[in-house]
From Swiss-Prot:
Pathway: Cofactor biosynthesis; coenzyme A biosynthesis; CoA from (R)-pantothenate: step 5/5. Catalyzes the phosphorylation of the 3'-hydroxyl group of dephosphocoenzyme A to form coenzyme A. The gene is coaE. It catalyses: 3'-dephospho-CoA + ATP = ADP + CoA + H(+). This is Dephospho-CoA kinase. Belongs to the CoaE family. Its EC number is 2.7.1.24.
């Protein structure tokens, strides 16, 4: 039986570090962010719908989607954000499911669905176990400011636009505390995977 793990966390909590650790253990990772980029490539059904709803001003000169521009359009406009989600989410869900089924058919021990907005997008039904990568609020803020060159105000707004991390922690099957060293994170992951009988 393939165990389907939903990997999530707050923005800048270090989820991609954990995602990489799964890959190093030869456990396949299906990345929602990569799929979200692929489903809106020029000519795909979701791309055509976005142009229909948002107009050509969200396109680059070469006709590809201008993601930062679209991002700023929806970030401060709830109605438009919901419209965009209605287009993108079903396409992402369908592709993630397709890849997941493929790995299950191959008889993989486990497969990871790396979904930043697992709870917000109501995708928990796609997975068997939920693993949340968590950090203390000040660590999250510092990392986000450093990583994205954000001012404190901007970083705080991004963090607050997601479900609070402590809420995600409450709904998790297991939690990795990512405030410490890489080695510490790796050890926590191994303990969890042994508990779930995924590794020996």
């Amino acid at each position: 039986m393939t165990v389907v793990i939903g990997l999530t966390g707050g923005i800048a909590s270090g989820k991609s570090t954990v995602s990489q650790m799964f890959r190093e253990l030869s456990i396949p990772v299906i990345d929602a962010d990569i799929i979200a980029r692929e489903v809106v490539e020029r000519g795909k059904p979701a791309y055509n719908k976005i142009v229909e709803v948002f107009g050509t001003e969200v396109l680059q000169e070469d006709g590809e989607l201008d993601r930062p521009k679209l991002g700023s359009v929806v970030f401060y406009n709830e109605e438009k954000r919901l419209q965009l989600n209605k287009i993108v989410h079903p396409a992402v869900r369908e592709e993630m499911n397709r890849q997941k089924e493929m790995y299950i058919k191959e008889g993989m021990q486990a497969v990871v669905l790396d979904i930043p907005l697992l709870f917000e997008s109501k995708l928990t039904s796609l997975v068997d176990r939920i693993l949340v990568v968590a950090v203390k609020p000040h660590t999250q803020l510092e990392r986000l400011m450093k990583r994205n060159n954000f001012l404190e105000e901007e970083a705080t707004a991004r963090i607050q636009s997601q479900m609070p991390l402590e809420e995600k922690v409450k709904n998790a099957d297991e939690v990795i505390n990512n405030d410490g060293t890489i080695m510490g994170t790796k050890t926590q992951l191994q303990v969890i995977l042994k508990k779930w009988n995924i590794i020996d």
